[in-house]
Amino acid sequence: MDFASYNLNNRPHPLVNMQGHIPEETAQRVHGVFQGVLGGDQSAFSRHLRIADEDRVKQPYMAVSDWYCDFVRSGLITLSTGKVDSLNGNTATVAPGGDKIDDIAAVVVATGFDASPCLDFLPQDVLQKLNHSPRHIDLPIALAFHGTHHPEVPDLGFVGFYRSPYWGVMQMQARFLARYWSEPGENGGSSKLSVKLAEDVSIQRTLDLRDDPRCSQFPMGDYPFLMQDMAEALGLSITEPLTEGLPNLPHNGKPLNMLTPARYPDSSEAGDDSQKLREGTRSVALAGLTSPRFVARAVFRSLLGTWKLERDLVSKLPSHPTGHFSGTGRFLLRRQTSDGLRCATDGTPAAPPHDEEGEAWEYLYIEEGEFKTEGGFGFRATRRYVWRYDERRDVLSVWFVKPEDDRRADYLFHEVEFGMPGESGGGGRGGGGGGKLGKGWPAKAGHLCIDDFYNVQYDFAFQAVNLREWSVGYTVKGPKKDYTIRGTYTR
C-alpha cells in the first residue's frame, strides 16, 4: 500500500498539498483510487460497506485492517447503518430508522484520541496563544509551519503533535526546531527557511479547517508534500531513487520511485546508513514486483470465511470411486497454536512464531458437503486441516489434524511453493479481470504418504487485493491409488 501511495512518479512535481479542504471533484477521484485498489465498492462484503454514488462526492475516510471486511462477510461482525440514539439496558436504538440492536454485552466508545489532556501542563495564557480548542479533537491547537511552533511562544516546539504522524515528518519537524532555535538569525533574513516562514499560513489554515464540513481525514498535510516542503526550508535535497532492476510500471511507464526518510540524509556521516536503507527499499520492491514474495501472505489473509467448493474426483481404480463433491470450506481464524511444530531441544513444544505485532495466526479449515459417485450413490463427507503462515519465512503451509482431536494440528501435509503467473499454466497476475482459473498465481506442493505420492497444484486468482477464486488439484499415485482431484473455491 505504501509503495502505491508514496511513489513519487505517480504525481506531478512540485508536489502540492492534497489534504485539508477536499472539493467534490477531488473526493470523487480519490474514491476512484480506493475502489481500484480494493477491486470494487465493497458491496461484495456487505451492503452496509458499499460506497454509494451519493457518497463519492464526500471526502473519503480510510481504515486499514487485514480481517475486518471478511469478518463482516462471514457474519462474525454485524453492521448497522446509523448512529446510536439511545441505550436502554442491553438494547440500543439506532437513528435514523429506529432499528433495535439487542443482547449488547459491552459498548466501545470509538471517539478517537483526544490530545487536549496532553496539554494540561501548559499555563492558560499559553494555551490561548496556541488557539487551544478542546472540542476540535483533530485540530486542538493551531501551530505554524506544519505543526512545529507558535511565534508567540518562541521557546515551545512540537514534534509529532498532529493526527496520524509519520516518522519522516517527525524527523523533519525535529530538524526544523533544531535549526529554528540554534540559528535564530535565519528566521528574519533571506534564507530558504526565512522565506518559507514568511510565506507560511499554517495557523490560519488550521483555524479555517476546524469547522470546515469538507475537512479531510488527515488535515495537516499529506506525507510526500510535507517532506518536500520541510526539506526545501532546511536546504535538504532528496537523493535519487535506487531503481536498478526495477521494472517500469504499466500505468505510467516509469519505475517505482519510493519516498522514504532515508532519501533526505542531513550529513555525510548519514550517507552510508541512507544508502543501506535505500538499498533495502529497492530489494523489497524488486522482490514484490518480480517474484512471488508476499503472495503467500496475501493468500492467507484473504482465505478467511466461507467458500463454495465444487470438486471432481476421477479414479482409474475401482477401489476409489469417481464422483463429484459439492459443499463448503470454512477458514476459521484463531491464534496460532504450537501443535505439530518442531519441538525445542528440551522436549517441550516450541512456542509459535509471532508476527510484527506480537501475534501469529492460523486457520482451522472445515470442509463439509456431499459426495456423489458416478453410480448415483451419495454420502456426507467432511475433512479438516490447519493452515498456517510463517511470517519470517514467507511460507504458507497445510497440516493434518489429530485423529483424536480434529481441532488440533498433527503433522505437516505440505508447504505451498508459489511461482510467477505464466508458470505451470498461470497466465496473468489475477488482477481486475483475473477470475478464470489458470490466470492467477500458480503454486505447487508434494507429499509422500508411505508409498503414495500426492502431487499438488494450486491456482489463486485475485481481484485487486482480494482473492476471488482459487483451485487445488491432487494427482495421487501409488501401489493402490491412481486418481486425480480438482476442486474450485468461489465466494
How does the language model describe each region?
Residues 76-93:
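A conserved short coil-to-beta-strand element within the FAD-binding core of flavoproteins
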Residues 1-46, 53-58, 62, 77-79, ...:
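Rossmann-like dinucleotide-binding core of oxidoreductases
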Residues 1-2, 120-160, 191:
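Glycine-rich loop(s) and the adjacent beta-strand/alpha-helix scaffold that form part
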Residues 152-294:
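C-terminal, flexible cofactor-proximal segment of oxidoreductases
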Residues 102-114:
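Short hydrophobic core segments
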Residues 288-491:
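Soluble ligand-binding/transfer domains with enclosed cavities or grooves
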Residues 2-67, 115, 236-285:
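Flavin (FAD/FMN)-binding glycine-rich loop and adjacent Rossmann-like elements that form
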